[in-house]
Amino acid sequence: LLAGALAGTAALYVNRGGPVHGEAETAATGAAPECPVNPAHAEAISAAAVGDVAAMLAAKPSKQLSGLAFKGPYGKALSIGDFKGRTVLLNLWATWCVPCREEMPALDALQAKAGDASFEVVAVNVDAGEDQGKRQRFLTETGIRSLKDYAEPTMSLFNATKREGLALGLPVTLLIGKDGCLLSAMNGPANWAGADALKLIETAKGL
């Protein structure tokens, strides 16, 4: 059922305040520095991104994303740099984004299956200027148990990824290596609970 629901919304990821999908963004000045080219990593990710996660395009060139900042549980200031040494699947979502809401149980299942000392699904809520309790209520009502509570209520995280040309709308998902370098990116939802996603993550963890 989840795969079917996601398939029905795959082309309908949301750009609040703008059109739905299809509009490329031009990276602004102050762009993140590029990481050293690693053809082997790009080739491995491209080979593993099939089926449910075929839209996860390998980063060519890669970008250094350690500076992306957000809040962790209890409001603790964090950045991707705090996850150095771990592979991260960074997902930006909002409670008003229907495809995001449908995708969350699959992300939770992926964290339950693959989350360990070397990997974490970091799902960051980007609801801005709204009732922040709405996020916790949604997570509780949806039965999200494995994902930690990450948030960035000022939209600066989304805008940073948008400036880099990575985010066109929500949800947006970035696979980030142990060194903080982008491995691959995707706009729109996916079935993260399936075998294809697990294979991609296991490949990334081995890089």
What is the role of each PLM region?
Residues R101-G143, P153-T161:
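Structural microenvironment flanking redox-active thiols in thiol-disulfide oxidoreductases
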Residues E141-S146, A151-T203:
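Thiol/disulfide oxidoreductase modules built on the thioredoxin-like
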Residues L57-S62, G67-V88:
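A short beta-strand-turn-helix
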